[in-house]
Design a protein with these regions (language model features):
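N-terminal helical capping/dimerization or prosegment-like subdomains
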Residues: 1-91
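Generic secondary-structure signature for well-ordered alpha-helical cores
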Residues: 18, 45, 132-135, 164-165, ...
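Active-site metal-coordination/substrate-binding segment of hydrolases
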Residues: 74-145
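Short small-residue beta-strand/loop micro-motif enriched in glycine and branched aliphatics
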Residues: 108-110, 205-211
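Acidic/histidine-rich catalytic neighborhood of metal-dependent amide-processing enzymes
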Residues: 114-190
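Acidic-enriched catalytic cores of C-N bond-cleaving enzymes acting on peptides and small amides
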Residues: 180, 189, 210-277
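Flexible glycine/proline-rich, aromatic-decorated loop/lid segments
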Residues: 186-202
């Protein structure tokens, strides 16, 4: 890739990142979400992907495209990413406007550049480069990019359920991770999930005088704090009985690989007591 092409890639990413696609503020960003999805779909066509289309929800469409020219015998890679971003609050802490991406030094600064428009764009530029320089991709590729990841992907599960044949693949690649340092990409084995729960504490039927009853009666807040603290052990693991029963443990070769490479990737000595992700 020559310097002119590299500069074009940066300009295209700047255009992509300039769309204010804050999904948590959907009511005021609907046109921006739709415009970004349309731009992304058009870019997929420009780089050589086929069968490009926009899928519901209309407010923040799912963008799909593929390249399946290797035939049914070749493996298929599914690339996932999202074009929505987090809010920019507080805006006065930004050195430059968040949706006017600028290059400073070796970095591009703008909302979404590191989550997830930049990572998503890396894969699109890799596809484009391979198609230009080699005329084909080494495997079949499907791409699915949504606009609701930052609000919990409320429509993604239904889309997957209703399009199993369309999304059938051998490997899925999540373009929403990080790089330990420049030119050293990371392969993430997994991310921590999220579990929401509501805990209600029933206590006294009315207010009690803290001076008269504070020593003998715990407050509801104190009880709640004690319960929350008992959910975790001192090492950060979950203390709820049975919580880890269905968690798949790393295979021996995976654990060995992590031990061998952890120090190189993090510049820290390997801690044998560190729980594997």
């Amino acid at each position: 890739m020559n310097a002119a092409t590299a500069r074009r890639f940066v300009r295209e990413l700047q255009t992509f990142a300039a769309f204010p696609t804050i999904s948590a503020q959907m009511s005021g960003r609907r046109k921006s979400m739709q415009a970004c999805a349309a731009w992304l779909a058009n870019h997929l066509r420009q780089i050589g992907l086929q069968n490009v289309r926009l899928e519901p929800p209309v407010s923040s469409p799912i963008v799909y495209g593929d390249w399946l020219q290797k035939g049914v015998e070749a493996p298929t890679l599914l690339i996932y990413g999202h074009y929505d971003v987090q809010p920019v609050d507080p805006p006065d802490e930004w050195s430059t406007p968040p949706f006017q991406p600028v290059v400073r030094g070796a970095y591009l600064y703008g909302r979404g550049v590191s989550d997830d428009k930049g990572q998503l764009f890396i894969h699109l530029k890799a596809i484009e480069t391979l198609l230009v320089e080699r005329g084909a991709l080494p495997v079949n590729v499907r791409c699915i990019f949504e606009g609701e990841e930052e609000i919990g992907s409320p429509h993604l599960a239904d889309f997957i359920e209703n399009n199993k044949r369309l999304l059938r693949s051998d490997v899925a690649l999540l373009s929403d991770t990080a790089m330990p340092k420049p030119h050293l990409p990371a392969i993430a084995y997994g991310l921590r999930g999220v579990l929401y729960a509501e805990l209600t504490v029933s206590h006294a039927v009315g207010d009690l005088h803290s001076g008269n009853y504070g020593g003998s009666m715990k407050s509801a807040l104190q009880i709640l704090c004690e319960l929350i603290c008992r959910l975790f052990r001192a090492d950060g693991s979950i203390a709820i009985e049975g919580f880890y029963e269905s968690v798949e443990k790393p295979k021996p070769f995976e654990a060995a690989y992590i031990r061998q490479n952890l120090a190189r990737l993090t510049a820290m000595p390997y801690d044998p007591n560190l729980p594997l992700p």
